[in-house]
Design a protein with these regions (language model features):
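Conserved ATP-binding TGD loop and adjacent catalytic N/P-domain core of P-type ATPases
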Residues: 8, 12-18, 22-162
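Helix-interface capping motifs at the ends of transmembrane segments in multi-pass membrane proteins
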Residues: 165-182
Length: 182
């Protein structure tokens, strides 16, 4: 029976499900599996972020097989599995040594990592503590809004840089020219 349950465990985990065993007096009685359904726009959101040149990581407490199966469905290539709730913040700290990091989360366990990231993005339907910890709150639960928010931020920054250029140009060139004519 143990061998059969082990095979069932492996099969369920490879499907992105978390197997749970029922045990009575130390003997396995059965196995069921639970699974989170990925958001229907996950694959599109991941593809958009990757097209923007952003490396996407999935940081999860799920076991490696379950995490890999979910990542495959969503199109994520970098998976860090088996992370305890306190560990997400440490992972973000490590990733920050490689460059700028944005973190998207919706739960209580995500709050420290959202705070640690250069940009914390909370899903609006998430826990209040995650929303309070984030820099940006997505009002809807659409993951495609993450790439839209990043595009908006980049466009805003580009506009600021252009305005600063013209302000300095005016102050350095035009004001002395105007002063010379009086």
């Amino acid at each position: 029976v143990a061998g059969e349950m082990e095979q069932q465990y492996e099969a369920l985990a490879e499907q992105g499900k978390t197997p749970l065993f029922f045990v009575r007096d130390g003997h396995p009685m059965g196995i069921i599996a639970v699974a989170d359904a990925i958001k229907e726009d996950s694959a599109q959101a991941i593809a958009e972020l990757q097209h923007m040149g952003i490396d996407v990581y999935m940081i999860t407490g799920d076991n490696e097989k379950t995490a890999q199966a979910i990542a495959k469905q969503a199109g994520v290539t970098h998976v860090i599995a088996g992370v305890l709730p306190d560990g997400k913040e440490a992972v973000i700290r490590r990733l920050k040594t490689e460059g700028r990091v944005a973190m998207v989360g919706d739960g209580i366990n995500d709050a420290p990592a959202l705070t640690r990231a250069d940009l914390g993005i909370a899903i609006g339907a998430g826990a209040d503590v995650a929303i309070d910890a984030a820099d940006v709150v997505l009002m809807k639960s659409r993951l495609t809004d993450v790439s839209a928010a990043i595009r908006l931020g980049r466009a805003t920054l580009r506009n600021i840089h252009e305005n600063l250029f013209w302000a300095f140009f005016y102050n350095i060139i035009c004001i002395p020219l105007a002063a010379g004519f009086y």
